[in-house]
C-alpha cells in the first residue's frame, strides 16, 4: 500500500472516529438545542440545499470574500516588490504589517463598521487578513532568489521577462503558493466573522446569526459545514489553478512534453 493511500485511510478512520464521538456526545446530552447529532446536522443541510436563498447566500458571501482575497493577492505582490526595491517603502510598511497581524480580527471588524457598510465589510476584512500573510510570503521568496543567477542576468543584460522567468518566479512562486494556502483559510474565517457582526442581508454570516438567536442548532452546524466545505473547495481549486500557472510560466509543461 502506497503512502498516499495509507494516509487517506488514516484520515477517513480518524474522521469516522470523531463523528462517532460527536454522535455519542449528542446522544448522552439528549438536548438538540445544545448539541445536535451529525445525522441531524446533515439532514438540516439536505433540507437547505433545494432552497434558492441558500445558494444566494453562498454566492453573496463567496463573491465578497474572494474579492477581498484577490485584492490582497494583488496588493501584497506590488507592495512586497516595492519594499524590496526601496528601503523607505520597507520601513514605511513594516509597522503597518505588524499592526495588522497583531490586531484581533474582532477589533478590525468593529472599527471598520464605522467606515464601510455591512455588505462591504467582508471584502475589507478579508483583504486586511490576507495582506500581511502574502506580503511576507512574497518577501521571503524574493529574498531566497539566487544571487549568482541575478549577477549573471545583469552581466548578460537579460531582458526583464527572461529574468522573471529564470530567476524571480522560481524563487517567489513556492513561497507564494504556501502563503495562499494559509491566506485562503484565514480570509474565509475572517470574512464570515465580519458578516456575523456586520449582518449584511443575504449573507452566510447573517444566516449563522439568525440560527443562533432562534436556537436552531442544526442549522448552525449545517452552515458551519458549508463554510468549511467552501473554504476547502476554493483552496483546492485555486491551488490547482496556481500549479498549472506555475508549470506554464516556468516551462515545466514544455519540458515534460
Model regions: which residues?
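Generic hydrophobic transmembrane alpha-helix motif, especially the helices
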Residues: 98-133, 140
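Short cytoplasmic-facing helical segments at TM-TM junctions of multi-pass membrane proteins
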Residues: 137-176, 208
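C-terminal transmembrane helix and the adjacent membrane-cytosol boundary/short C-terminal tail
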Residues: 87, 178, 222-257
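Transmembrane-helix boundary motif in ABC transporter permease subunits
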Residues: 67-97
